[in-house]
């Protein structure tokens, strides 16, 4: 059985949010005082794995784990390891991750060891003052260290930037030059 959308296109890519929680409060994403889903309403890692198995059986070849911030999910590496093992016995080819980067320094090596070869990092500015303003209490230095640690572990990084008028639209060239210097 294959998944086909209303335009008769084959669906082979699944994005799955593993948590609604995040360690940042980016202005355009979360309120400072968020109300999160009760834990009993969040899928367990086993349920997420079963869901992924069903989609893999229907032709999904790529799974992207997202959140909130997926790296704050307890035992996320165990899920990634289980999904990675499916690459050898199913049609699954790739597991990727979208993250704010705040925990990458801690997890980069484990992510690589468990089959993550590409990560999207949400980063709207490299100006520390603006970063603190947009994230409320984020630390740009941790994110940069995490990006560098990921690169050191041969993980490809893609930077996702939300361009906002009167905030960061004049920083795009600097951000591009910065990423080029990282050899992303």
Q: What kind of feature is each model-predicted range?
A:
Residues 1-13, 177, 181:
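Auxiliary Fe-S-binding modules of radical SAM enzymes
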Residues 2, 38, 126-129:
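Residue-level signal for pocket-adjacent positions within structured domains
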Residues 6-46:
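Canonical Radical SAM [4Fe-4S] cluster-binding loop centered on the CxxxCxxC motif
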Residues 18, 70, 163:
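Hydrophobic adenine-recognition pocket in adenosine-nucleotide-binding enzymes
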Residues 36, 67-70:
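Glycine-rich, proline-tolerant flexible connector loops at the mouths of alpha/beta enzymes
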Residues 45, 49-64, 73-177:
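Radical SAM/AdoMet-radical enzyme domain recognition
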Residues 184:
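Histidine- and aromatic-rich ligand-binding microenvironments
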């Amino acid at each position: 059985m294959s998944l086909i959308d209303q335009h008769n296109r084959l669906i082979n890519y699944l994005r799955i949010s593993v948590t609604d929680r995040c360690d940042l409060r980016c202005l355009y994403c979360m309120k400072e005082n968020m109300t999160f889903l009760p834990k009993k309403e969040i899928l367990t890692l086993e349920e997420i794995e079963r869901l992924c198995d069903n989609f893999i059986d229907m032709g999904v070849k790529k799974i992207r784990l997202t959140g909130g911030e997926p790296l704050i999910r307890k035992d996320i590496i165990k899920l990634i390891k289980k999904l990675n093992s499916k690459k050898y016995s199913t049609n699954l080819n790739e597991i990727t991750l979208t993250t704010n980067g705040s925990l990458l320094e801690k997890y980069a090596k484990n992510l690589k060891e468990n089959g993550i070869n590409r990560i999207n990092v949400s980063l709207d500015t490299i100006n520390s003052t603006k970063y603190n303003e947009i994230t409320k209490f984020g630390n740009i230095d941790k994110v940069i260290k995490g990006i560098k640690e990921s690169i050191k572990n041969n993980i490809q990084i893609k930077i996702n930037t939300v361009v906002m008028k009167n905030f960061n639209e004049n920083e795009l060239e600097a951000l591009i030059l910065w990423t080029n210097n990282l050899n992303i």
